[in-house]
A protein has these predicted regions:
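Hydrophobic/aromatic beta-strand elements that line small-molecule binding cavities or substrate pockets
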Residues: 8, 59-65, 84-91
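Beta-strand/loop substructures that line and gate deep hydrophobic ligand-binding cavities in soluble
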Residues: 77-127, 134, 143-147
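Intrinsic-disorder/low-complexity, polar/charged segments enriched in Ser/Thr/Lys/Arg/Asp/Glu/Gln
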Residues: 3-7, 48, 58, 71, ...
């Protein structure tokens, strides 16, 4: 069972969202709760890395699963709490994608903080997903459209 679920419809193809997700160094552009993120290897299952949060905490993470252009899941440990973040998308049309981010909270002391963390994560993840949506839509507008060519105008 997920503790937090947020979702949005993005007016962008999945490829734009995937480019954003898979570039961990750019995570602060859309996830404003992080100051810096890095992976110590390629964007694939098993790769470890870390994010430094705005409050200065280091959050080690591991990519648990990566399904190209569909989803990825990472685990993280923050103090004595285990977090699992799931990022999924489903193409609705050529230029529209359903994106879902969810989080699970676990660990020996998670029951003490679950309510507070659930509220904080809901706010943070909603903001992050809104920012991701805006960024993907801006990039999609600037990206060349394949299969479509401009129609030249002739002055009469």
């Amino acid at each position: 069972m997920n503790d937090v679920n947020v979702q949005v419809i993005v007016k962008s193809p999945p490829s734009e969202i995937w480019k954003i997700w898979s570039n961990f160094a750019e995570a602060p552009l859309w996830d404003t709760d992080v100051r810096q993120c890095q992976l110590d290897g390629p964007f694939q299952a098993g790769t470890r890395g870390k994010c430094v949060l705005k409050n200065g905490l280091n959050m080690p993470l591991k990519l648990e699963a990566v399904s190209l252009h569909e989803s990825y899941r990472n685990s993280a440990r923050l103090l004595w709490i285990d977090l699992e973040f799931d990022h999924r998308m489903r193409r609705l049309s050529a230029d529209e994608t359903h994106v879902v981010h969810s989080a699970k909270i676990s660990g020996p002391l998670s029951f003490l903080y679950r309510g507070l963390l659930r509220k904080a994560l809901t706010v943070a993840m909603t903001t992050a997903l809104d920012n991701l949506c805006t960024l993907a839509e801006q990039r999609a507008i600037g990206a060349p459209r394949h299969g479509k060519t401009a129609t030249p105008l002739h002055l009469v």
